[in-house]
Each structure stands twice: as structure tokens, then as C-alpha cells.
Amino acid sequence: MPRKKGRKPRDKKRKKPSTDVLSGAERHLVTRFSYGLTKDLVRDVRRRGADAWFAEQLSPGKVGDAPGQEVDGWWPSLGRSPLDLWQRTQSEVEPGWMVMEDYMRRALVRRVRSRRQVLEVMTELWENHFHVPVAADGVFTHRVAYGDAIRSRALGRFSDLLFTVVTHPAMGIYLDNATSTASRPNENLGRELLELHTVGRGLFSEADVKDSARILTGWRVDVWKTFAASYSPEDHATGPVTVMGFSDPNRSADGRELTRRYTDHLAHHPATAKRVARRLAVKFVRDEPPQALVDQLARVYLQHDTAIVPVLKALVASPVFKASRGTKVRDPAEDVVATYRALGVKLRRPATQDSAAEAILWQTDGLGGRPFSWSRPDGAPITNAAWASAGRMAASFGMHWAMAGGWWPSKDVSYRSARSWLPGKSVRFDDLVDHLAERILFRPASKQLLKACCQATGLRPGTKITKSHELVEWGMPRLLATLLDSPAHMTR
């Protein structure tokens, strides 16, 4: 009986899996702790193993990163001093919001290009936890240095990170500690330090907030003049203070060491340990992590003097982490960055406002998730519900379509040609889908994905595809976009 056209022969031998395919466990670890797989990253993991890759990533100084470091010089104003930035704004040479847009671009492009993927992921996590919106009044003068300070401590001790962010001029400007005085302590930072950054709601009193604010007085910024940061002993409120089990006579007008001891106490508080553990578990495991896992991670955190690396090691070793594949939705910025990486798109130094390294910010904006722009001090959500709406998905599909076709952005950027995706002169459509899945999603194509690709293109599994086929001539964007629209790409 003649075989129906387009049907795959039953005895057809399937090709061997590509060397670019990772095991499920490897892919799970690497996608959770990166901004998406690339050919080079996958080959590195296959050569050394995912565990060895992760171990090296936890010591970013050991990871050569010329592509990521090159980005540092692409936007010169990010290296200017606070006074210079302020004067340029006042003279209408360069407004602060433009500098902040460049800061967002640098972060996004770093995530695309950097080989230090775990460092970039952890930097974003802490920059969101200790959120200072880039649009807040005056923070542009110190916001770049604030992000850099977090990045340099993202894999260190939480106690060191906490002291750094609480005393940083950017945080002081945002939450008004920069103008807090002994006679009129401002409670904003004192409250958020307890509620958002450490122990959490419901565990502290208004008296705790008042003393927290008094402890933090003295850390000043000359706002709207030079924006110079300093410590002012005459503005420090002295006298006994008690907060969450921390007590001090607070006799000295120089409260800097007091601040250090106070933040160190909060960093080591059991409630803080559980909040840090839960945040890591929500980010890297699932939206509602088991309490047993949170408690385990909190113990590791305290046993290692608030060091983050041992907590991450314990997290990835847990059975709960291993069983959590495919449970986290990529947020808008993660989706944009992962799409650049999956398609092998090469960004170059921006020459104009239309350059891809500039336009990448508008891409995240179009999906409703530009970096560092959440309006409240609690930081952007890291749970699925916030990013899984129909509107967001439709916006992502549009972005995937534009990039699959290489239509936008199109300046100072390189896309692969449609023909370059073909594995040979002639290939069955189902084998082409497999080939693309292995090079874009780095996994074999599922039956559901093949069905979706057939529906999107109107082709049958057995259709022969050549370089002159209409799919290659004009239909490849639809096929590539179908892969990018799949759950395999939309989750991490």
C-alpha cells in the first residue's frame, strides 16, 4: 500500500542527539542561574559538567569575561562623578534620566554578553531586593555606583552587602536618610531596613522604627548642590537605642561603627535568615517553596556567617530544586535577554540611538518590564503571576517575531541568515524542527512543539526543505518565533 504523502516512514532511523543538547538536570541548573543558553555556554557545560561550571561561576574572578567587560566603555557618562552628572543636568547638556537609561542598557547588554552569568543573575536579585528606582529624584548622581557596589558583593556575605547599601548615598537620597538629622530623624530608611531588607513585617514596633532611624542619622548627602556624600557627627542622634534585640548606649556622635554593628545584628537575625532563604528559594526554585527548604537554607546562612555561596550550593543540591524544572516564568527583561542569546544575536557598540544596544531598553519597555524601574521600594515581583498575563505574552510574541526576522532592532547588530539555520542542502521538516530546537532551546523537539511548528507554517513533518524552499525564502521567522513562543523558552 503506498505511503501517504508527508508521513514519516516507520523504519526511519532518527539522527543521534546533537552535541549541543544538555541533559534535563544540566539544563535546569544552567537556565536557573543564567540569562539563557548559548552555543558556547552549552559546549562549556558539556565539556566540564554543570556542577563544575556552577562552582567556577561562584568565583567570578576566575571566569574570563572580555565580552562583558567590553560593555563597560560603551556609555561614557556612566563613569562620571556625581558632581559632573549634576552639573551636566543643570546646564541641560545631559539630563539624569538619559544617564539612567544608559545604565539600564548596560545592565541588559552585560546580561546578553557576559560569561559571568551567575554574578549577573545575583546582582539583579540583590539590586531588586535593595531596590532604588532609577527614576527617583536625585538618585541618578549615585545610582551607577550603587549598582556597582552591589555587583562587587553579590556573592559575598549578606552582612557586608547590607551595610554597604544602607549607608550608600543612593539609598540615602531615595529614602531621605541623606537629609535626616538628630533633631528631625527621617524614618523612611529605618522602617524599610526592617520591613523590606531584613526581618520583615509584623516583627517590629514603631519604637523600633524610631530607634532604627536614630541609629542611621549622620549619613549625609549634599543634595541639590554638590551631591557629595559625607558623615556628619553633629547630625547623629545620640542616646540609648533598642531595636529587635539590639541595644546600645549610643554615646558617640560618630555613629558609623554603631551602624555597622546594628546592620550586622539584623543580618544575623533568624527572621532575616528566613527572609533571605525564602527570597532565594522563590527566585530559583518555585513561587511557594516548602518551609522545610527555607528553614534548611536559613540554617546554612547562619552557620556560614551570612555567606551567600554556601546557601546557593545547598539550594541546588536539594531534591526540591532538582524537582522544580519548568516552574518559573521568565520576566520581560529575562525574555528579551534570553532571546538575544538563543538566536545568537551579536550586539555591537552603539553608534546612534537606533543601535540595538540602545533599542534593547525599548524592547523591555514594550513588554512592561524595564529594569530598575519598579515605582515602590519593595522591588519588582519575582513570582509567575506578575508576568504571565495574556497581554505580556502577546507582547513577548511580537518581540520574538521581530527578532526572528531580524527586523528590529536592525542597527549595529548581526543576526543569522535564514539559510544558516539549515543543517544541510535538504532536510525533512520534522528533522529541521529538531535541529532548531537543539540549537535554540538546546533540547530535542517535543511532539507538541512539532505540531505547533506544523500549524504555524502549514507544512507536514515529511516535507523536504531546501535552501530555495519558501520556508527559507520568507517563512523562517514564523518557524523561529514558534520555538521562542514555546514554554521551553518562556520558562527558565
How would you name each of these model-derived features?
Residues 33, 110-111, 129-133, 196, ...:
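Alpha-helix C-capping/helix-to-loop hinge sites
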Residues 2-15, 85-87, 103-104, 139-355, ...:
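Active-site substrate-binding loop specific to GH73 endo-beta-N-acetylglucosaminidase modules
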Residues 27-32, 95-98, 184-188, 234-235, ...:
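Short, compositionally biased low-complexity segments
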Residues 42, 50-53, 209, 432, ...:
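Hydrophobic/aromatic residues in well-formed alpha-helices
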Residues 3, 39-153:
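N-terminal accessory alpha/beta regions
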Residues 89-93, 113, 133, 177-180, ...:
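A ubiquitous short alpha-helical element
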Residues 10-39, 269, 273-304, 313-492:
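Flexible, low-complexity segments enriched for small/polar residues
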